[in-house]
């Protein structure tokens, strides 16, 4: 009995309202227990006063309930060691107890931090999408502007080219005597046109157009002389001084002798006929006859003029094309016809 009040002072909860159960006597016992162990020992008079009330009954019930709760709590810890503190709160009588658990506060703090992080993530995603859409819109506008500019320039160039061609055609119709803008050298072959070749031929000397092959003409000259000797042996025998001169002369033929075999058939026949009619009076007359029978360079030059074989513009571009000379001729014919009509 002596140890009971001390145990009650240390083990019982301070939430019990002793003034409600035992009144002033219980309050006195509680105060005496707080002061010192010797003074806290109750006397017989106080126990008699307390026994008359329900204070002991309430204390007994409280002790039994606390023992039962402790025993049940130990069993739950053995069977379920990972249970949370929420089950312990449900087992206790919450009417007279207030239990503060820090784990719920930590969970609440973690939930708040997670929500804040997710909000920041969503804000970043939305901002990135807005930025990408703005860049895409700017690029699309720039490309569309470039396309419109290119299209406008293309239309202007096309219209300008058609207008230029129309203007050129109208100018040709109004002024047919204007010189043809086609260059002298064609774009396909690079060769001069027929008219340009004629102009170049007139400007350049005709002697430059001669073709000479000295290595071949010696053979022709020997054959020609051998045939003449066979036909006219008297001429060959009556002119002995001319033979040494021919032997002493160099083997390279002269300009006129080199071009002799390329003469046409009419010229060769005339030369042989003139050589046959020459009489063998003297060597001087024979040499003069041979010189007279041989053609001169002036007579040979027109026969060896090489003309370039190049198609004209009329053959290339069709019969509708007219050169400058043809335009002038047609213009003169038109003027003559107009004058005849007026007369």
From Swiss-Prot:
The lineage of its organism: Eukaryota, Metazoa, Ecdysozoa, Arthropoda, Hexapoda. A motif (PY-motif) lies at residues 191-194. It is a single-pass membrane protein. Belongs to the commissureless family. InterPro entries: Commissureless (IPR031878). Essential for nerve cord development. Functions downstream of fra to control axon guidance across the central nervous system (CNS) midline. This is Protein commissureless 2. The chain crosses the membrane at residues 123-143. It holds the Pfam family Comm. Residues 228-253, 323-343 are annotated as: Disordered. Keywords: Cell membrane, Membrane, Transmembrane, Transmembrane helix. It comes from the Eukaryota. One of its GO terms (cellular component) is plasma membrane. GO terms for biological process: axon guidance. It is found in: Cell membrane.
């Amino acid at each position: 009995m002596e140890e009971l009040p001390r145990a009650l002072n240390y083990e019982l909860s301070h939430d019990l309202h002793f003034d409600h159960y035992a009144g002033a006597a219980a309050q006195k016992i509680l105060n005496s227990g707080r002061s010192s162990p010797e003074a806290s020992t109750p006397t017989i008079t106080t126990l008699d006063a307390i026994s008359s009330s329900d204070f002991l009954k309430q204390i007994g019930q409280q002790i039994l309930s606390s023992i039962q709760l402790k025993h049940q709590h130990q069993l739950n810890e053995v069977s379920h060691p990972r249970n949370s503190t929420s089950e312990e709160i449900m087992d206790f009588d919450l009417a007279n107890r207030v239990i503060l658990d820090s784990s719920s506060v930590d969970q609440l703090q973690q939930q708040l931090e997670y929500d804040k992080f997710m909000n920041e993530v969503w804000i970043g995603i939305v901002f990135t999408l807005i930025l990408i859409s703005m860049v895409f819109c700017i690029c699309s506008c720039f490309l569309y502007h470039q396309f419109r500019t290119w299209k406008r320039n293309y239309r202007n160039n096309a219209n300008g080219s058609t207008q230029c061609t129309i203007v050129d055609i109208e100018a040709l119709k109004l002024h047919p005597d204007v010189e043809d803008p086609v260059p002298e050298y064609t774009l396909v072959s690079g060769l001069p046109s027929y008219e340009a070749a004629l102009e170049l031929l007139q400007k350049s000397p005709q002697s430059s157009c001669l073709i000479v092959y000295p290595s071949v003409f010696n053979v022709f000259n020997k054959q020609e002389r051998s045939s003449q000797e066979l036909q006219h042996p008297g001429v060959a025998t009556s002119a002995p001084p001319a033979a040494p001169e021919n032997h002493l002369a160099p083997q390279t033929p002269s300009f006129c002798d080199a071009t002799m075999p390329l003469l046409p058939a009419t010229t060769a026949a005339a030369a042989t006929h003139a050589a046959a009619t020459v009489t063998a009076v003297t060597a001087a007359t024979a040499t003069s006859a041979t010189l007279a029978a041989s053609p001169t360079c002036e007579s040979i030059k027109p026969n060896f003029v090489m003309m370039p074989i190049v198609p004209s513009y009329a053959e290339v571009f069709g019969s509708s094309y007219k050169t400058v000379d043809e335009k002038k001729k047609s213009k003169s014919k038109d003027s003559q016809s107009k004058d005849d009509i007026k007369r």
